[in-house]
Amino acid sequence: MQSILWFALIASVVFLVLVDLASGLNGLETLSSGADVDELTTATRLLRAAHLDRKLSEERAFISGESIGSWWTKVTEWLRVKFELIIAYIKQLRVKSNDVKDDAATNDAAHAKDDAAANKAARAKDDASRATYEAARANYEAARAYDDATRAQDVAALEAARAIEATDIAAYTGANAEYEQSMFLNGFVKTIDLHNEKNAPIMTRLNKSLDEAKKSSTFREIADGVNESKVALVVHEKQDGYLLWILHLKWAVEAKSPKDVVERILKDLGTHDVPHLQERAEQVKKAYTIFLLYVERMSRATHPK
C-alpha cells in the first residue's frame, strides 16, 4: 500500500513537471511565433509573474542563505502554482479552440458569400447567353420565313413562266401543224398536177364525175365515177401512191363519218407497198383528215340545207 502511494506521488510530480515544461514551451512558441502577448489571458500573465517572482525570491534566499518557510510549505506552494498553471493552460486551449471555431465559421461564411456571388455571376452570364441565343434564333426564324416567302414567289413566277411557255408552245405547235398541213396539201395538189399527164384518162373521168356531182342532186355519183376508174388503179398501182388517193376518195364518199374513213385509209396503207407514205404516217393522217373535211365541204356546197 505504501509503495502504491509513493508511486502515485512520483507520477503526479512527473506529470506536473511535464505540464510545466509543456506550458513553458508553449509560451516560448507563442512568443517566438510573433504572437501578441495580449492574446494570453490576464490570469496566465499574473501566474507567470508570480511564478517568476517566487523563483527570484528563492534564488536570493539561497544565495543569502535565508530560508523561506518549511519544506512542506514550499511543496504546497509549488503544487498550487502548478495547478493554477494547468488551469490557465486549459483556459488558453479553450480560447484557442473557440478562436479556431470562430475562424472556421468566418471562413465558411466568407466561402458561402463567395459561392453565392459566383453563382449569381454565373447565372447572370447564362441569362445573357440565353438572351443572345434567343435573339439569334429569332433572326434565324425571320430569315427562314423570308427565304420561304422568296422561294414561294420564285416558284409562282416560274409556274407563270412555264404557263406562258406552254401557251407559246401550243400556239407554235398549232401554227406549225397548220403550216405542215398546208404544205402537205400544196404538195398533194402539185402531185396531182404532175400526174395529170400520166393519168390523164383517170383524171379526166374523175373531174368529169366531180363536175357532174356538182350539178346533180346527189353526191353519190362521185362513187360511181371512182368505181369506174378502179381498173386504172390496178393497172397503175406500181407507178405512184398517188393513185391510192383516188380510191380513198371513193371511200370518203361511201363512209358514214370521217373517223371511219381515216381508220380504213390507215389500214389500207399497211397493205400497199408505198414506202414514202408509210414513213410519213402522221403527216398522211393529218392530210387525209383535212382532205376528208374538204370532201365534206364539197358535199355541203353541192347539197346545201
Swiss-Prot record:
Glycans are attached at N207, N227. It is found in: Secreted; Host cell membrane. Keywords: Glycoprotein, Host cell membrane, Host membrane, Membrane, Secreted, Signal, Virulence. Residues 1-24 form the signal peptide. The keyword Nuclease does not apply. Residues 247-269 are annotated as: W motif. The keyword Secreted applies. GO terms for cellular component: extracellular region; host cell plasma membrane; membrane. It comes from the Eukaryota. A motif (RxLR-dEER) lies at residues 45-60. The RxLR-dEER motif is required for the delivery of the effector to the host cell cytoplasm but does not bind phosphatidylinositol monophosphates. Belongs to the RxLR effector family. Interacts with host A.thaliana At1G14340. Secreted effector that confers enhanced plant susceptibility during both compatible and incompatible interactions between the pathogen and its host. Promotes the sexual reproduction of the pathogen in the plant host. This is RxLR effector protein 17. The lineage of its organism: Eukaryota, Sar, Stramenopiles, Oomycota, Peronosporales.
